[in-house]
């Protein structure tokens, strides 16, 4: 169920402060965050945000198509290594 329009998008305060500070200074340093639940807003365009995936921080460059999505969508938490190919030695019979 989508969030109510009167509430607006959710962005953690500490992340919003860091983005606003860099926008006012005109710098584009990497912002490290654990806030996967924050929504991408237009103020973040052009910034690189390192989103934590549970093990490391994945750098995500924010573009127009990402606005409205959550940061966690761009840093997958699970790595699928593929199914093991059928092993003839393990089958007996």
UniProtKB/Swiss-Prot annotation:
InterPro entries in the cross-refs: Ribosomal_uS19 (IPR002222), Ribosomal_uS19_bac-type (IPR005732), Ribosomal_uS19_CS (IPR020934), Ribosomal_uS19_SF (IPR023575)
Full protein name: Small ribosomal subunit protein uS19
Keywords recorded for this protein, A-Z: Ribonucleoprotein, Ribosomal protein, RNA-binding, rRNA-binding
One example GO MF annotation: rRNA binding
HAMAP family referenced in this protein's UniProt entry, alphabetically: Ribosomal_uS19 (MF_00531)
Lineage of source species: Bacteria, Bacillati, Actinomycetota, Actinomycetes, Frankiales
Organism, as annotated: Frankia casuarinae (strain DSM 45818 / CECT 9043 / HFP020203 / CcI3)
Homology family: Belongs to the universal ribosomal protein uS19 family.
Keyword Metal-binding: no
Signal peptide per UniProt: none
Protein's job: Protein S19 forms a complex with S13 that binds strongly to the 16S ribosomal RNA.
SUPFAM superfamilies per UniProt: Ribosomal protein S19
Gene name, Swiss-Prot/TrEMBL: rpsS
Record bears the keyword RNA-binding: yes
GO CC aspect terms: cytoplasm; small ribosomal subunit
One of the GO biological process terms: translation
């Amino acid at each position: 169920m989508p969030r109510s329009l009167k509430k607006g998008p959710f962005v953690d305060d500490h992340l919003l402060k860091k983005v606003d500070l860099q926008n006012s200074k005109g710098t584009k340093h990497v912002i490290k965050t654990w806030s996967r639940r924050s929504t991408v807003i237009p103020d973040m365009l052009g910034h690189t945000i390192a989103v934590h995936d549970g093990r490391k921080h994945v750098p995500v460059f924010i573009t127009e198509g990402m606005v409205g999505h959550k940061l966690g969508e761009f840093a997958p938490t699970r790595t699928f290594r593929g199914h093991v190919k059928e092993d003839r030695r393990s089958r007996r019979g």
